Design a protein with these regions (language model features):
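N-terminal, positively charged/glycine-rich alpha-helical extensions of SAM-dependent methyltransferases
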Residues: 1-36
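Conserved alpha-helix/loop element of class I SAM-dependent methyltransferases that forms part
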Residues: 46-63
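Class I SAM-dependent methyltransferase SAM/SAH-binding core
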Residues: 68-116
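A short acidic, Gly/Pro-enriched loop at the edge of an enzyme's catalytic core
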Residues: 117-126
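A short SAM/SAH-binding and catalytic strip from SAM-dependent methyltransferases
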Residues: 125-137
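A short glycine-rich, Lys/Arg-flanked "PGG" loop and its adjoining helix->strand segment in the class I
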Residues: 139-153
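Substrate-binding/catalytic lobe of Class I Rossmann-like enzymes that use SAM or dcSAM, i.e.
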Residues: 167-257
Length: 274
């Protein structure tokens, strides 16, 4: 089942979704909540992602019935919410997420951006798990208010920027103080919150570990070519320099120490006030 509002821009194509599912075998796209003694393995990552999902579900207020998952990814959260008796709907402007959701979850899907959505309303809870950062800040609470029942809830679990002068790390995520200011000026109040930055840290550590191994592997694989064809290697480097430099500049995004110094990953549950 599908519903949609007009999409003025080309539908997004989430290549990360395809990579995580098809290449890595991951059913979830979000960070994980790790235990202190967890090793950096694929199985531990999957368990951490499931723990994150369970944390969200356990945090749902009593009396909640109808739930909208904004940026529903692979549909795993909706699938488990439905199994627990909730009436769920998904929302995303991404064509791949739409396809995966249709294959996995028998529920209504809204093929649109949240800020452009024409929702009928009546939701008890809206969940934004790592999707709030993609929604214009001035639209987050405005559209949520229109879509929720009186005294409905907005659950945000995402990372925010603490330092706007931190280069690449400052480019993704809402400014933390601006987000809280926007919330304070809205019709919502915070009813619970938790800083989970320490819990998600190992997600970055395992990503950085994989990146190092990939770079080392690429170096080893090209070693003989570089030795035997130095001139051709210079040409290859020249053509691929911009992509290589971009990859290096973006590697900082998975540096756990720098991430935790510049960003804050927080769970915040808001309630709409009369």
């Amino acid at each position: 089942m599908s519903s949609s509002a007009p999409i003025t821009e080309k539908a997004k194509n989430d290549r990360a979704l395809r990579f995580y599912r098809d290449a890595l075998g991951l059913e979830r796209l979000h960070y994980g909540m790790w235990l202190p003694d967890d090793e950096l393995t694929m199985e531990a990552l999957k368990a951490a992602q499931k723990r994150y999902e369970d944390f969200l579900i356990d945090s749902i207020p009593e009396g909640t019935r109808r739930v909208l998952d904004v940026g529903c990814g692979t549909g795993e959260l909706c699938l488990h919410l439905k199994a627990q008796g909730y009436e769920v709907e998904g929302l995303s402007p991404d064509i791949n997420q739409k396809k995966v959701f249709a294959e996995k979850v028998e529920a209504l899907f809204h093929f649109t951006k949240f800020e452009d959505s024409q929702l009928e309303g009546g939701y008890d809870l809206i969940i934004m798990s790592e999707s709030c950062q993609y929604i214009p800040l001035d639209k987050v609470f405005e559209v949520a208010q229109q879509a929720l029942n009186p005294k409905g809830y907005l659950m945000v679990c995402d990372y925010f920027v603490l330092d706007q002068n931190a280069g690449e790390l400052s480019k993704s995520g809402h400014d933390y103080n601006e987000f809280l200011k926007e919330a304070e000026e809205s019709a919502f109040e915070i009813v619970s919150r938790r800083d989970i930055t320490p819990d998600i840290r190992k997600t970055l550590e395992i990503a950085d570990d994989w990146a190092e191994k990939i770079l080392l592997g690429a170096d080893i694989l090209t070693e003989k070519f570089r030795e035997r064809n130095p001139f051709l290697w210079k040409i290859v480097k020249w053509f691929g320099l911009s992509k290589y430099e971009k990859a290096l500049s973006q590697k900082v995004l998975i540096d756990a120490d720098k991430f935790c110094a510049v960003k804050k990953y927080e769970f915040i549950l808001f309630q709409l006030q009369p």
